[in-house]
Amino acid sequence: MAPQLLLCLIQTFLWSLPEAESNVFLKSNVANRFLQRTKRANSGFEEIYPANFERECVEERCSKEEAREVFEDDEKTEAFWTVYVDGDQCLSNPCHYGGTCKDGIGSYTCTCLAGYEGKNCEHDLLKSCRVDNGNCWHFCKPVQNDTQCSCAEGYRLGDNGFSCIAEGEFSCGRNIKSRNKREASLPDFQTDFSDDYDAIDENNLIETVQSQSATLLKKSDNPNPDIRIVNGLDCKLGECPWQAVLIDEKGTAFGGGTILSPYFVLTAAHCINKTKSIAVVVGQVDISRKETRRLLSVDKVYTHPKYVHVTNDYDIAIIQLKTPIQFSENVVPACLPTADFANHVLMKQDFGIVSGFGRIEEKGPTSNILKVVMVPYVDRHTCILSTKIPITRNMFCAGYGNQPEDACEGDSGGPHITAYKDTHFLTGIVSWGEGCGRDGKYGIYTKVSNFLPWIKTIMRRKQPSTESSTGRL
């Protein structure tokens, strides 16, 4: 009985299917009244028709070449393609200070307004150390999107955040006397010396440190290291207060130096090997007046360990005195710059100042009067082309090339000073040259900024030793 009942149910279900289909599915002619499928444009022969943006890049994923066919313009194609591929990178307005954004694939480019730079035009050049030294009088340091000023030793930062105020009466780099008030006389301490000065004679002058290249001193074909002011002006008392003079065992001036601190004088390494003994004189503008000068005895001499006599590379040495220099309005140390300040600010100035008691012309007599001359900086390429002698990274050129104004014999070791905001910084040491003031030739100077760590390491030894000695570091 049960099998017959199941069979009847199946048969009844099968009979009802056609009627169910007619109730659920519409006939095609009726269905097309309500449901329509949008067909692609120009289907069938689309390649023979003009490019169509909708067909090429909306309905389908187009290639860059297909987009080029649509726009028929490279610039418009690039503008579309960079957005089409990965979206518009400029939607977030990444360019600051009114910069214009141009989208790229996976990147963007900002075109900055004048006075701004950086990937997002985020750097205000008015707040950059590269523009007018960030308005800093001395040293400038970039800090995030701003600048931070600081000052040389002996100065404090002004309330305005960029000026430098001298803390002491004889802070470094100051010309205390105005030129019109200077007198051609020796400073007071020269005629009435303190007991702190150690007056010495040739019997107690120390022997200087011998160079490791001393055997090369007999060579005569190297550039003139001693020959280094031609056609300079008289340096009035107090105008070159950082000038030091090196005196040999005969009491003759043979080179120059720069006062760095009460105990230290900077000079050229090649000067150290020119005499058996040396002493130092400061505050003097007329070396013929021997009766009024006092010699400062030397405690140690530090010649740079890499100094090469033949090439005059690393031509730098430091003299440490036994007793401190007494500063006055006529005796003031030069300021030491930072390397960045020297390289990017000071040495970008037009002129440096060179002083000394050297020959007043090539092969001429030396000068008893301190001379000073302003010499322009020379770009490195011109400097290198001016001579067959190697110009190393530790050297730079200064001079006119077509005017006979130069350092000359007897000026060696003396200061090359650059003034900035009324402060005078040491930028070079008179080193060597081919003759004096020759046409097409320049004076060569030791680049002090390369040696600041070495200088400061030695100057930390402020206290002189109890016994005279020589040394190398």
Swiss-Prot record:
Domain EGF-like: from-to ranges: 86-122, 129-164
Record's subunit section: Heterodimer of a light chain and a heavy chain; disulfide-linked.
Keywords: Blood coagulation cascade activating toxin, Calcium, Cleavage on pair of basic residues, Disulfide bond, EGF-like domain, Gamma-carboxyglutamic acid, Glycoprotein, Hemostasis impairing toxin, Hydrolase, Protease, Prothrombin activator, Repeat, Secreted, Serine protease, Signal, Toxin
A Pfam family this chain is assigned to: FXa_inhibition
Entry protein name: Venom prothrombin activator vestarin-D1
EC number: 3.4.21.6
GO biological process terms held by the UniProt record: blood coagulation; induction of blood coagulation in another organism; proteolysis; venom-mediated blood coagulation
Keyword Glycoprotein: yes
InterPro entries reported in the protein's UniProt record: Coagulation_fac-like_Gla_dom (IPR017857), EGF-like_Ca-bd_dom (IPR001881), EGF-like_dom (IPR000742), EGF-type_Asp/Asn_hydroxyl_site (IPR000152), EGF_Ca-bd_CS (IPR018097), GLA-like_dom_SF (IPR035972), GLA_domain (IPR000294), Pept_S1A_FX (IPR012224)
SUPFAM superfamilies: GLA-domain (SSF57630), Trypsin-like serine proteases (SSF50494)
Gene Ontology molecular function terms on file: calcium ion binding; peptidase activator activity; serine-type endopeptidase activity; toxin activity
Gene source species: Demansia vestigiata (Lesser black whip snake)
PROSITE patterns: ASX_HYDROXYL, EGF_1, EGF_2, EGF_3, EGF_CA, GLA_1, GLA_2, TRYPSIN_DOM
Domain Peptidase S1: 229-460
Location(s), subcellular: Secreted
Residues of this chain annotated as glycosylated in UniProt: 92, 273
Physiological role: Snake prothrombin activator that attacks the hemostatic system of prey. This protein is functionally similar to blood coagulation factor Xa.
Reactions listed under catalytic activity: Selective cleavage of Arg-|-Thr and then Arg-|-Ile bonds in prothrombin to form thrombin
Residues in Gla domain copies: 41-86
